[in-house]
A protein has these predicted regions:
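Phosphate-binding glycine-rich loop
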Residues: 26-73, 86-91, 97-99, 164
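N-terminal "arm"/small-domain region of PLP-dependent enzymes with the aminotransferase-like
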Residues: 1-26, 225-227, 355
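Structural detector of well-ordered beta-strand residues that form the stable sheet scaffold
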Residues: 50, 75, 96, 149-150, ...
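Conserved active-site segment immediately N-terminal to the catalytic lysine
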Residues: 151-186, 215-217, 222-227
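Active-site PLP attachment segment
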Residues: 168-212, 237
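Conserved SAM-binding loop
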Residues: 51, 76, 97, 192, ...
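PLP-dependent aminotransferase-like
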Residues: 64-153, 160
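PLP-dependent aminotransferase class I/II
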Residues: 33-38, 43-49, 110, 114, ...
């Protein structure tokens, strides 16, 4: 069976994890946490990079830093993972769901402004499949309305918009190192980028359970105490050690994933040209980090049949998100009419993800491609 995903091991993870154990520093913010943070700051120019226990925690930190609270509204695409909305719901915010673009699952920037009210505080663009949203339009809207922008870059490591790294354009960026991502911190992990100098000190305090502990270890204060809200967002050194091994091989990982992505694209573009399905749309302003290769079928029944057919042929293809605006939680807690978001619903019904991981063999990619051609009778 060709799995949908398989976490890649570089071979150095266990060695670095042993080093972390041997030093006796396990609780975080040690050598490997600092190495990872420095990597992101130096490679991508992020103002401040803060390792977290998950991408969800990075989003929750961003929500706190935006001072989101009861009565505030946050604009989020409906076609996304629940964490994109949940982080702000936990602060008491009301979520305003936006539709996707017609040709890709990203938030439709042209529909954002109509959703803004005097209560709006944050826009959350989600870079689906690592492909950039229209950040020029989004930042222009945010600047004119004095709103925060929190980039959900969970899938977008090493991806760019007009030469700028994703996660480094809005006020905050949030990454995930879950085992399904291009690189992983041992199954779970995340990163918050703080791109506005005004928020760096408070971000460190929130990260350290509401204390100024980070300043204490830098020798800036002679003792530390409780100074603000916060939580236990700091990951273990074991997780950071695992991630460091992955980051050292990031270029190798990316090159292989892009080669697989390109094989899918070349092998299926003619079939897509016949109208059987559509493939990922990469705008000229964006780069492709090969996080995912997906197809958009013509309807739900066709997608269901394709997934079943590929399973019969030994390939693990899967669908993705359900529309959050149609979720049980949202309908139970939402006041007013449920929005109609047809593009989002179409991706929820029709999008299918193909196997994508570093060790996926070329011959297995060809099996998937051939099976899809056979499914459509071509």
């Amino acid at each position: 069976m060709i799995p949908f995903n398989k976490p890649f091991l570089t071979g150095k993870e266990a060695h670095y994890m042993y080093q972390a154990v041997y030093t006796g520093k396990l609780s975080g913010n040690g050598v490997f946490t600092k190495k990872c943070q420095q990597f992101f700051e130096e490679r991508y120019g992020f103002r401040k990079a803060i390792m977290t226990t998950s991408g969800t925690d990075a989003l929750e930190m961003a929500a706190i830093l935006c001072d989101v609270g009861p009565g505030d509204e946050v604009i989020v695409p409906s076609y996304t993972f629940v964490s994109s909305a949940l982080a702000f719901v936990r602060q008491g915010a009301r979520i305003i769901f936006a539709d996707s673009c017609e040709n890709n699952p990203n938030i439709d920037a042209d529909k954002i402004e109509a959703l803004i009210t005097p209560k709006t505080k944050v826009i959350v663009p989600v870079h689906y499949a690592g492909v950039a949203c229209d950040m020029d339009k989004i930042m222009d809207i945010a600047n004119r309305h004095n709103l925060f922008v929190v980039e959900d870059a969970a899938q977008a490591i090493d991806s760019y918009y007009k030469g700028k790294p994703l996660g480094g354009i809005g006020h905050f960026g949030c990454f995930s190192f879950h085992e399904t991502k291009n690189v992983t911190a041992g199954g779970e992990g995340g990163l918050l980028t703080v791109n506005d100098e005004r928020f760096i000190r408070r971000a460190e305090i929130i990260w350290e359970k509401g204390t100024n502990r980070a300043e204490f270890f830098r020798g800036m204060v002679n003792k530390y105490g409780w100074v603000d809200t916060g939580s236990s967002f700091l990951p273990s050194e074991i997780n950071s050690a695992f991630l460091w091994a992955q980051l050292e091989s990031l270029d190798t990982i990316q090159d292989r994933r892009k080669a697989i992505w390109n094989q899918y694209h070349e092998g299926l573009k003619d079939l897509a040209g016949m109208g059987s399905f559509t493939m990922p749309d990469i705008p000229k302003c964006a780069t492709n980090n090969a996080h995912m290769f997906y197809l958009v079928c013509r309807n739900l029944e066709e997608r269901t049949a394709l997934i079943s057919y590929l399973k019969e042929k030994g390939a693990g293809a899967v669908f993705h998100y359900l529309s959050l605006h149609l979720s049980e939680f949202y309908k139970d807690h939402h006041v007013g009419e449920i929005p109609k978001l047809p593009n989002c619903d179409r991706f929820a019904d029709c999008l299918v993800r193909l196997p994508m991981f570093f060790e996926l063999m070329d011959e297995d990619v060809q099996i998937v491609i051939s099976s899809i051609w056979n499914f459509y009778g071509k």
